[in-house]
Regions:
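Long, acidic/polar, low-complexity amphipathic helices and coiled-coil-like
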Residues: 97-111, 115-206
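Bacterial N-terminal signal peptides that target proteins for export
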Residues: 2-15
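Extracellularly exposed regions in secreted/surface proteins, prominently low-complexity, repeat-rich
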Residues: 181-225, 257-261, 265-269, 286, ...
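Extracytoplasmic low-complexity, Pro/Thr/Ser/Ala/Gly-rich segments
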Residues: 33-128, 204-238, 339
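C-terminal motif of bacterial Sec signal peptides marking the signal peptidase cleavage site
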Residues: 21-24
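Bacterial signal peptide processing site
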Residues: 26-29
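Exposed beta-strand-loop-beta-strand "reactive/processing" segments of non-cytosolic proteins
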Residues: 87-114, 171-190, 221-245, 301-324
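Short, non-transmembrane alpha-helical segments in secretory-pathway proteins
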Residues: 68-93, 145-165, 207-223, 276-298
Length: 339
């Protein structure tokens, strides 16, 4: 699934999503690119600032193209230099998208008049190519901020994870304001997401201590007060947190092999908040193992203060059987009830 398919899905999840990237097959030149401690605070993706195009920035004129730019090694080994030159040809303007395959690199920039312009490198030549990308307010970025030099390693990771066909590294807005790197393929098989530091996003399970710890850490991020947190195989890991703005709930989700994403909604929950330091992933994992009918059975876990006690309570719904524990994993179903 391409980043654009995920973008459509995410916009059904997110409230108030306002940006979209309409990309077909991308620019064409030759072959077109396709498009048990408690969790500690860790940074989560934040919207990427979009630099404004300089009103005086002018790309290299078409009459000076094609431009010779030979490289001594393969494109993948020379990707940083090639992308840097493509960006120079584009006058250093804010970038909407970068595609890199083994044979071609393409960069699409945002012009001061809000139109877009694409340049491609192939076989030692840089040319202006047509693009079907439209600017609808999506985030722009500077390619120098992303580890283009790691493209070989990212391709190797994608291959190990079963991405088959011609591999394509894309740097592009994935959700509103969030620019991510992905490796997908042509023909499309699957997609591997990479963080800005070049590390691959793993698919987390919902029963082991390691996976539960990682999932809770990612959705807590730098948060200090939770309205609720939980996970299940359908929704993934999620957390509702306080926001800097009063009357707003910050929601974070981490589903499958997709990075954490954030949404905000206007709400003042009646439930009290609690500290993420109270969470004990090992105790949650042990409770799941105790309540599962079979080792492969999934449970829907929710932790919040909705039961009116002095500390948060964990609720486990395993195939319709509901149990409750405190944060140490002690069963308290008889104290809380069966709701």
């Amino acid at each position: 699934m391409t980043p654009y398919t995920w973008a459509m899905i995410s916009r059904r999840w997110a409230v108030g999503a306002a940006a979209a990237l309409l990309v077909g097959c991308g620019p064409t030149q030759g072959q077109p690119p396709v498009s048990t401690p408690s969790p500690s605070a860790s940074p989560s993706p934040t919207p990427t600032p979009s630099p404004s195009p300089s009103p005086t920035a002018t790309p290299v004129p078409d009459d000076q193209l094609p431009l010779d730019f030979p490289v001594a090694d393969s494109l993948l080994d020379s990707a940083p230099a090639v992308v840097e030159e493509l960006h120079r040809v584009a006058a250093g303007l804010p970038v909407l998208k970068v595609d890199i395959t083994a044979q071609q690199a393409t960069l699409t920039a945002l012009l001061p008049d809000k139109s877009v312009r694409s340049y491609a490198w192939r076989d030692g030549l840089i040319t202006h190519v047509d693009s079907d990308i439209q600017y609808l307010g999506q985030a722009t970025f500077d390619p120098a901020d992303y580890p283009i030099s790691s493209v070989n390693r990212m391709f190797a990771v994608a291959d190990l994870r079963g991405v088959r066909g011609e591999l394509v590294l894309q740097v592009v807005e994935y959700r509103e304001g969030q620019v991510l790197m992905t490796v997908t393929s042509r023909p499309e098989t699957s997609t591997v997401f990479f963080r800005k530091d070049g590390t691959a996003v793993t698919t987390l399970g919902y029963t082991s201590v390691a996976d539960i710890t990682a999932g809770l850490e990612e959705v807590v991020g730098d948060g200090t007060a939770l309205y609720g947190i939980g996970f299940n195989p359908t929704r993934g890991y999620w957390a509702d947190l306080t926001d800097d703005e009063p009357g707003v709930v910050l929601s974070r989700s981490r589903v499958g092999g997709v990075p954490v994403f954030e949404t905000r909604r206007s709400e003042t929950p009646a439930v009290a908040t609690f500290s993420p330091d109270l969470l004990q992933p090992a105790a949650i994992a042990q409770a799941i193992a105790r309540y599962q009918a079979t080792p492969d059975q999934s449970c829907d876990v929710t932790v919040d203060m909705s039961h009116g006690r002095f500390a948060p309570v964990a609720r486990y719904d395993c195939a319709g059987t509901v149990r409750f524990t405190d944060m140490a994993g002690r069963d308290m179903t008889d104290l809380v009830g069966s709701g």
